[in-house]
C-alpha cells in the first residue's frame, strides 16, 4: 500500500493560463479513456477530479475513479471517498474540535506514540462568530459593549484557541468581531482553485471544503463543492482521512425567467426551500442550471445555497460562470487568481454558459423566477412558507390550530389575552413582534437586501415612523464590509434612528444568541400567556431557538424585518393596513416605504467597490487588538486544568488500549427519550442559555459560578461534563416518556419517577442498563452539531430508532459508536404499539453489513416479547469499522498510533 498519488489514465496534463507563463499541471478529466464525462453534473465532475488526483491504490483506488466516472442517474448506492482541499470551523464547533485534537495528543503520549503526528495536514480556518450575544441594542454603544462582554465571558476559550494557533500547523484563526464564517469564506477565504507543490511543478485543482457548520453550503453559490459535517468527521479529514460517502443522486433545479419588481433573494430562497422539502432531497446534491441563472447575482445564489440544510440537500450547487468571475473581481480577488479560475474550469468542461448542454440528472425540478412573491416562513419551520399577503390570516389561524408544525392550540377564550408592559399603559396581545433582527450570513452577505433594508429605514424616518416600543431590534452583519457600504450609501444613520444599530459581527440572533428581552416585555408576555412573534432574516426558526419567550418565529428578508418592527405585529394585514402614521397624522402603508429595484441598484452601484473588501480583509487575522492582547501558552501538549469549567479532557479515548471490539447484541436496553417528527439537533443539544435549576446550571453553581456567568451551552462545548448534562435539555423538547412536561425530563423506569434526563441516565449507567432513543421522521435535522451525537453517547445511549434521519446527524451517531436504526415499510413506534416503557434487545450479527436488516426484541411490562425488523443505518463498510472501533476518531487514532509505532520499529 502507498499513499503516493498515481497518474491514472495519463490524466496529468499541462494547464495553459492566458497571459501567464507559469508552468501548471492539472488532472484532465477529458483524458479518461472509455468514459464520456461531458454530460456529468458539474458537482460530480468535482468529485471525479478529486478521486482521479488523489488515487494512491490505498484509501483512493482506481475502482473509485471508475465508479465516479461512470456516475449515472440511476446509480446503485456505491461508497466513494472524497478528500476536500480544506476545512472551515466556527468557534462553537471549532473549540470542541481543537479540544479533541488536544485530547488525541494526550492519548498518543499515554499510549507511547508521537503527539506531533496529530496535526492538520490540510489548511484549517476557524472564524470566531458564535460567541457574541445581543445584550445591548438600540444604542450607539451596543457594538462596543457587546464585544467587551464577549471577551469577558469567553476569555478562557479564546486563550485555548490562541494556544491552538501555535500548537498546530495549517491552523489559522480569524478573530472575533470580523464576521460570520460563511460570509468570510465567500468574500475572502475561498480561492476557486487551490494548488499544491509536487516534484516537477505546481498542481492546481478545484477549491473544495467541509465545515463544522451545516451552512457551509453557502460556498456552493461560488461554484465550490462543500458541505457541513460534524466536528468528529472534520477532525478525521484534517488528519488526512477521506470522507466516505454514498455516490449521491443529483437533482437538477432548472431556473428560468427573471425576478419581478418587489421580490427579494430571501423570497426566492424560501420558495426554493419549500419546493425542495416537498420534493424530498435529503442526502442528495441539488445542482442549479438553466438560462435563468444569468439573471441571478452571485449573492442571490449564495443565499439559496446557504439554505441547503433547510431543504435537506447535501449541497445546493451553482456552477462557475461569468457571474462568479465578476463576483471575485467585486470582492477584490487578484486578477491572476481570477484568470486561473476561468482557465481551469473552462479546460475541465465545468464552466457554465447559457449555451451549455443540460447535464444528465437523477431527476429535475423547475422554477420560473417571475413567479416569486414577497414571503415569510414559519412559525416553527423554515420550509413552511407564507405569502406576505396571507401572513396575518395564516398567523391568526395558527393560534387555534393543533400543536404540530404550525399551530399553538389556544382555546377561544384565550384569543383576546393581553399583557401590560411594566411602567407604561401599553398593552400587547398575541402576534406582537417582540424581536426584529437583521441577522445571519444567509442574508447579510447579500447587498441587495441590506441596501433595501436601509432604504426602507430611510423612507420610514423621512415619514416620521418609529419602531414600536416593545420590539427588540438589532443589526448583526456577517462582515465588516456591510458597514462600509451602508455608511457610504448614507443608510446606516437611518437604520440607527429606528433602533437597528449594529450590535456585533457574528451569528447572534440567528443561532439563539439574541440576548434577553427587556424584562417589562417578558412580564407582559407571561401575564397574558401570549404567543408573541419574532421576525428575523435568519435561516432557522425552530421552537425555543430564537428566544425562550417567543413561540412564533418567522424568517423574512431584511426590508421586511424593518417593516414588521415598524408595524409591531403580525396580526394585521401589513400589505393593505397602515403600518403607522406620518408626522401629519396621515396613514403610511408598506408600499409607501418599499424601494424599487432601480433604487436598490443605484445605491449599490455608488456604494460598493472592490477596495472596500481589500480594506476590510487585509490583515484581518491580526485586526482585533483585544484578541492580539491575549497571552499565548506554549507547547505541543495542552495543560488540562481540573478546575476549568470551559475546557476539559473528554473521555472519548479512555478505552483506546487494545483493538477494535467485536459487534455484539445489545441486551436489556431501556428507552430514555421518545419523540415525534422534526426533532432538531438543537432539541438534542441546545446552544443557548440555561438556568440555575438545570443539571448544567447546578454543576456550575456547585463550582462557584454565578448564573450571570453561565454563558451558553454553545460556549461550553469544550467541557463534556456540562454538555452531557445539557443533552436533550432544550426547554421545548417534548419527551413522550414524561407526559405533561416540557424540557429535559423523562421517566426512570427503574423506579417510575419523573426526573431529569441526565439524572435518569446516571441511574441507568450505575445499574448497567444500556439506553435507546425512539424518534420520528427527520431526526437530527438542523445544525451539524456533533455534540448532539457526543452527548447522546455520553448519556449511555447505544441505539436510536427513527423513521428517518437527517444526513449529518446519522453520520455523527455512527462517528460516536451509536447505532442508528430505521423503521421499515412506513412503520413507526406508534404503529408498532411501542410505548417506550418496554425493554429492548438489539440482535446484531458479528458480521453486520451496511444497511442490513436487524431484529429488535421488544418486551412489554406484561413479559410478552415480539420481534420487529429495522434497517441498520450504518451505510458503508468504512462505517462498520468506525462502529467496531467505537467511533471515527478512535479509528483514526488507532491507525496513526499503529503507523507511528511501525515507523519507530523500522
UniProtKB/Swiss-Prot annotation:
Monomer. [4Fe-4S] cluster binds at residues 441, 507, 510. Binds 1 [4Fe-4S] cluster per subunit. It is an enzyme of class 4 (lyase). Pathway: Carbohydrate metabolism; tricarboxylic acid cycle; isocitrate from oxaloacetate: step 2/2; Organic acid metabolism; propanoate degradation. One of its GO terms (cellular component) is cytosol. Involved in the catabolism of short chain fatty acids (SCFA) via the tricarboxylic acid (TCA)(acetyl degradation route) and probably the 2-methylcitrate cycle I (propionate degradation route). Catalyzes the reversible isomerization of citrate to isocitrate via cis-aconitate. Could catalyze the hydration of 2-methyl-cis-aconitate to yield (2R,3S)-2-methylisocitrate. The apo form of AcnA functions as a RNA-binding regulatory protein. The keyword Metal-binding applies. Keywords: 4Fe-4S, Iron, Iron-sulfur, Lyase, Metal-binding, RNA-binding, Tricarboxylic acid cycle. Belongs to the aconitase/IPM isomerase family. One of its GO terms (molecular function) is iron-responsive element binding. It comes from Deinococcus radiodurans (strain ATCC 13939 / DSM 20539 / JCM 16871 / CCUG 27074 / LMG 4051 / NBRC 15346 / NCIMB 9279 / VKM B-1422 / R1). Its EC number is 4.2.1.3, 4.2.1.99. It comes from the Bacteria. Residues 1-2 form a propeptide. InterPro entries: AcnA_IRP_Swivel, Acnase/IPM_dHydase_lsu_aba_1/3, Acoase/IPM_deHydtase_lsu_aba, Aconitase/3IPM_dehydase_swvl, Aconitase/IRP2, Aconitase_4Fe-4S_BS, Aconitase_4Fe-4S_dom, AconitaseA/IPMdHydase_ssu_swvl. This is Aconitate hydratase A. It catalyses: citrate = D-threo-isocitrate; (2S,3R)-3-hydroxybutane-1,2,3-tricarboxylate = 2-methyl-cis-aconitate + H2O. Its cofactor is [4Fe-4S] cluster. Gene3D superfamilies: 6.10.190.10, Aconitase, domain 3, Aconitase, domain 4. GO terms for biological process: propionate metabolic process, methylcitrate cycle; tricarboxylic acid cycle.
Amino acid at each position: 500500500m502507498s499513499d503516493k498519488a498515481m497518474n491514472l489514465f495519463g490524466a496529468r496534463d499541462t494547464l495553459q493560463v492566458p497571459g501567464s507563463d507559469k508552468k501548471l499541471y492539472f488532472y484532465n478529466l477529458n483524458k479518461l479513456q472509455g468514459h464520456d464525462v461531458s454530460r456529468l453534473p458539474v458537482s460530480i465532475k468535482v468529485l471525479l477530479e478529486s478521486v482521479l488526483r488523489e488515487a494512491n491504490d490505498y484509501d483512493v483506488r482506481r475502482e473509485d475513479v471508475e465508479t465516479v466516472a461512470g456516475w449515472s442517474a440511476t446509480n446503485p448506492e456505491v461508497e466513494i471517498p472524497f478528500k476536500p482541499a480544506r476545512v472551515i470551523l466556527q468557534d462553537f464547533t471549532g473549540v470542541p474540535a481543537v479540544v479533541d485534537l488536544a485530547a488525541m495528543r494526550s492519548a498518543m503520549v499515554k499510549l507511547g506514540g508521537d503527539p506531533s503526528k496529530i496535526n492538520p495536514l490540510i489548511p484549517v480556518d476557524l472564524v470566531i462568530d458564535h460567541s457574541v450575544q445581543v445584550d445591548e441594542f438600540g444604542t450607539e454603544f451596543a457594538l462596543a459593549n457587546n464585544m467587551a462582554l464577549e471577551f469577558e465571558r469567553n476569555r478562557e476559550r479564546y486563550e485555548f484557541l490562541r494556544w491552538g494557533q501555535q500548537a498546530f500547523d495549517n491552523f489559522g484563526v480569524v478573530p472575533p468581531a470580523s464576521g460570520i464564517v460563511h460570509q468570510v469564506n465567500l468574500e475572502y477565504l475561498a480561492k476557486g482553485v487551490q494548488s499544491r507543490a509536487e516534484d516537477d511543478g505546481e498542481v492546481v485543482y478545484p477549491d473544495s471544503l467541509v465545515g463544522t457548520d451545516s451552512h457551509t453550503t453557502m460556498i456552493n453559490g461560488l461554484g465550490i463543492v462543500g458541505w457541513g459535517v460534524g466536528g468528529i468527521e472534520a477532525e478525521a479529514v484534517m488528519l488526512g482521512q477521506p470522507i466516505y460517502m454514498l455516490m449521491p443522486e443529483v437533482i437538477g433545479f432548472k431556473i428560468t425567467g427573471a425576478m419581478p419588481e418587489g421580490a427579494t433573494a430571501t423570497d426566492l430562497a424560501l420558495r426554493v426551500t419549500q419546493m425542495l422539502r416537498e420534493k424530498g432531497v435529503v442526502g442528495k446534491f441539488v445542482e442549479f442550471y438553466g438560462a435563468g441563472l444569468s439573471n441571478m447575482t452571485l449573492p442571490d445564489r449564495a443565499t439559496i445555497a446557504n439554505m441547503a440544510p433547510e431543504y435537506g440537500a447535501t449541497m445546493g450547487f451553482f456552477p462557475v460562470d461569468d457571474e462568479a468571475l465578476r463576483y471575485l473581481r467585486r470582492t477584490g480577488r487578484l486578477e491572476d487568481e481570477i484568470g486561473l479560475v476561468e482557465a481551469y474550469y473552462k479546460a475541465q468542461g465545468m464552466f457554465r454558459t447559457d449555451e451549455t448542454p443540460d447535464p444528465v440528472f437523477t431527476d429535475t425540478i423547475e422554477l420560473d423566477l417571475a413567479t416569486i412573491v414577497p414571503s415569510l416562513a414559519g412559525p416553527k419551520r423554515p420550509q413552511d412558507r407564507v405569502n406576505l399577503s396571507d401572513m396575518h390570516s395564516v398567523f391568526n389561524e395558527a393560534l387555534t390550530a393543533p400543536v404540530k408544525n404550525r399551530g399553538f392550540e389556544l382555546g377561544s377564550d384565550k384569543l383576546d389575552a393581553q399583557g401590560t408592559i411594566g411602567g407604561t399603559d401599553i398593552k400587547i396581545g398575541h402576534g406582537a413582534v417582540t424581536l426584529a433582527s437583521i441577522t445571519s450570513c444567509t442574508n447579510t452577505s447579500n447587498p441587495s437586501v441590506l441596501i433595501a433594508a436601509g432604504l426602507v429605514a430611510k423612507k420610514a424616518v423621512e415619514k416620521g415612523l418609529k419602531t414600536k416600543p416593545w420590539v427588540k431590534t438589532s443589526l448583526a452583519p456577517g462582515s465588516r464590509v456591510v458597514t462600509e457600504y451602508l455608511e457610504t450609501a448614507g443608510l446606516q444613520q437611518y437604520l440607527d434612528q429606528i433602533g437597528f444599530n449594529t450590535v456585533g459581527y457574528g451569528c447572534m440572533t440567528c443561532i439563539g444568541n439574541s440576548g434577553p428581552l427587556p424584562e417589562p416585555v417578558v412580564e407582559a408576555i407571561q401575564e397574558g400567556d401570549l404567543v408573541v412573534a419574532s421576525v428575523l432574516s435568519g435561516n432557522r426558526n425552530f421552537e425555543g431557538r430564537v428566544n425562550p419567550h417567543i413561540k412564533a418565529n418567522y424568517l423574512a428578508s431584511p426590508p421586511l424585518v424593518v417593516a414588521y418592527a415598524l408595524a409591531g405585529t403580525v396580526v394585521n394585514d401589513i400589505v393593505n393596513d397602515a403600518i403607522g402614521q406620518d408626522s401629519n397624522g396621515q396613514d403610511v402603508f408598506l408600499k409607501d416605504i418599499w424601494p424599487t429595484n432601480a433604487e436598490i441598484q443605484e445605491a449599490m452601484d455608488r456604494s460598493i467597490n472592490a477596495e472596500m473588501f481589500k480594506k476590510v480583509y487585509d490583515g484581518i487575522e491580526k485586526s482585533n487588538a483585544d484578541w492580539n492582547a491575549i497571552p499565548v501558552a506554549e507547547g505541543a501538549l495542552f495543560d488540562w486544568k481540573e478546575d476549568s469549567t470551559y475546557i476539559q479532557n473528554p473521555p472519548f479515548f479512555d478505552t483506546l488500549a487494545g483493538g477494535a471490539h467485536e459487534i455484539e447484541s445489545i441486551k436489556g436496553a431501556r428507552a430514555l427519550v421518545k419523540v415525534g417528527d422534526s426533532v432538531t439537533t438543537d432539541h438534542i443539544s441546545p446552544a443557548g442559555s440555561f438556568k440555575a435549576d438545570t443539571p448544567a446550571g447546578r454543576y456550575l453553581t456547585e463550582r462557584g459560578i454565578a448564573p450571570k456567568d453561565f454563558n451558553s451551552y454553545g460556549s461550553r462545548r469544550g467541557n463534556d461534563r456540562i454538555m452531557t448534562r445539557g443533552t436533550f435539555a432544550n426547554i421545548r423538547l417534548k419527551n413522550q416518556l414524561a407526559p405533561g412536561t416540557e424540557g429535559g425530563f423523562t421517566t426512570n423506569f427503574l423506579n417510575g419517577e419523573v426526573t431529569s434526563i441526565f439524572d435518569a441516565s446516571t441511574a441507568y449507567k450505575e445499574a448497567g442498563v444500556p439506553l435507546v432513543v425512539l424518534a420520528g421522521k427527520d431526526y437530527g435535522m438542523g445544525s451539524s452539531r456533533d455534540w448532539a451525537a457526543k452527548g447522546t453517547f455520553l448519556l449511555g445511549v447505544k441505539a436510536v430508532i427513527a423513521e428517518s434521519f437527517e444526513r449529518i446527524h446519522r453520520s455523527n451517531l455512527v462517528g460516536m459508536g451509536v447505532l442508528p436504526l430505521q423503521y421499515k415499510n412506513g412503520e413507526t413506534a406508534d404503529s408498532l404499539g411501542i410505548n417506550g416503557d418496554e425493554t429492548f434487545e438489539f440482535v446484531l450479527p458479528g458480521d453486520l453489513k451496511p444497511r442490513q436488516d436487524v431484529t429488535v426484541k421488544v418486551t412489554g411490562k406484561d413479559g410478552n416479547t415480539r420481534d420487529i425488523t429495522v434497517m441498520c443505518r450504518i451505510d458503508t463498510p468504512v462505517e462498520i469499522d468506525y462502529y467496531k472501533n467505537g467511533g471515527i476518531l478512535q479509528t483514526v487514532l488507532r491507525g496513526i498510533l499503529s503507523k507511528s509505532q511501525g515507523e519507530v520499529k523500522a
